[in-house]
Design a protein with these regions (language model features):
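Conserved mixed alpha/beta catalytic, RNA-binding, or beta-rich assembly cores of soluble enzyme
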Residues: 1-282
């Protein structure tokens, strides 16, 4: 059997390995409570068994990490990274998303429903291997590396630029990659929007770099991101899992999504009530 292995981080940065459509390893949960999974799955205290059931549900429900992967979906949350991207694609504020999909790696997406399907229900993707059926589903010409399913947002940005896209959103996990993306030279008529997800366990020394370079950052269960936000006071939406709009462009993208769903614009109400957030912040 060909190598088929996908590593994701879910439910508070718990690392999970899936091989040939089956869970082969679940590490210990890093947090006790996630507001999103509390709301949607009634999980008050995260255990390894809860994680197993949730990941098995995703595999069965939409074929996560398998050839049966459903790629187009409706909104999962009212406001998350995928939902923000979906609305702004529909409105023409962005024309391409450099994203990541299991079985595919880095991929260019221009279909709002596919942006939601690819990113809306899959947690942080650490590594993956090619799955032909998923690659065919997103279109092999949109895949950075169909042979290895490589994850490289910077090379994805270069690919988007080579296609002539002008308003490019890039989703990325906390890493030095964020700075490389921001510093990559582009023409004056090109805008690059950087959206950072899965920030739980971000190191204190890395947080300033995130805020200096990103347009939107999700709080997740990150103690350091949330504490830093209290000092620099960016606009945000949400009390339990805030989404911070770091730049003016980030605020425009966030507020565009909020307007689409009839919500008031982002606010700067500080200090935030940490008691409504994940337990514990790490």
């Amino acid at each position: 059997m060909t190598n088929d292995e996908h590593v994701i981080e879910a439910l508070g940065k718990t690392r999970i390995t899936i091989k040939n459509g089956k869970i082969t390893d679940i590490q210990e949960p890093s947090i006790d409570y996630c507001p999103i999974f509390g709301k949607y799955h009634n999980i008050e205290h995260i255990t390894k068994e809860d994680i197993r059931k949730n990941i098995e549900y995703r595999i069965d429900d939409f074929g996560m990490c398998t050839k049966n992967r459903v790629l187009k979906m409706d909104d999962m949350l009212s406001v998350g990274i995928s939902e923000i991207l979906r609305s702004n694609l529909e409105q023409g504020n962005i024309d391409c998303v450099v994203g990541a999909c299991e079985g595919v790696g880095t991929v260019l997406l221009t279909d709002p429903d596919m942006v939601q399907g690819v990113g809306g229900r899959v947690s942080g993707l650490v590594s993956t291997t090619p799955i032909k059926e998923i690659i065919d589903g997103v279109g092999i010409d949109n895949v950075l590396d169909s042979k290895k399913a490589t994850l490289n947002p910077l090379e994805g940005l270069k690919m988007a630029l080579s296609r002539g896209f002008k308003n490019i959103a890039v989703t990325v996990l906390p890493s030095e990659m964020i700075k490389l993306l921001r510093e990559y030279p582009v023409d004056d008529d090109v805008n690059v929007f950087i959206l950072v997800a899965h920030t739980t366990k971000t190191k204190k020394e890395d947080v300033k770099m995130l805020f200096d370079n990103a347009d939107i950052i999700t709080a997740c269960a990150s103690k350091n991101v949330i504490e830093y936000a209290q000092s620099v006071k960016p606009y945000y939406y949400g009390n339990s899992v805030p989404i911070y709009a770091i730049s003016e462009e980030g605020k425009r993208l966030l507020d565009s999504r909020l307007e689409c769903i009839g919500k008031p614009p982002s606010v700067r109400d500080y200090p935030q009530d940490l008691s409504k957030m994940a337990r514990k912040l790490i």
